[in-house]
């Protein structure tokens, strides 16, 4: 798996291959909760000696667990990070927030100026700004024409067997990114 973001994900109980140990603060197979040792447990929903929920408790942890009960259906548990990443809401039936889902890659966003990609709406202005800072914008359309030629160091859309493949006319902005510096004294188109 080439997904480095997974390192920040809390492991599931089924991911742990050692036998369950009550009191180690890892929710493992067969445990309803695990808040550590009885001396250290600060979870009012969990019986630290048995790693079971206390009587009347529905849950002991999770983004959709409030005061030992499942959060109401529709309670926001993960906010929207962009137009392409809608907020997630509790189901009212479990303590965990649903998986983070994104709009389909390629769906138009920002008033059709960009397209969703992995939960973001990357547009060239934002990319230029991130690379170069304020006063830098997407260059004029004519600057992207070299991406159709395929003979420049960066002027192509992809490589196949080491050969640079030029961009189709409708894809010229999928190759090299051209930004324009609009600060005083800079007047070139690209």
Curated annotation (Swiss-Prot):
GO terms for biological process: proteolysis. SMART domains: ACR, DISIN. Expressed by the venom gland. Ca(2+) 1 binds at residues 21, 24, 26, 28, 31, 34. It comes from the Eukaryota. A motif (D/ECD-tripeptide) lies at residues 83-85. Residues 19-105 form the Disintegrin domain. This is Zinc metalloproteinase/disintegrin.
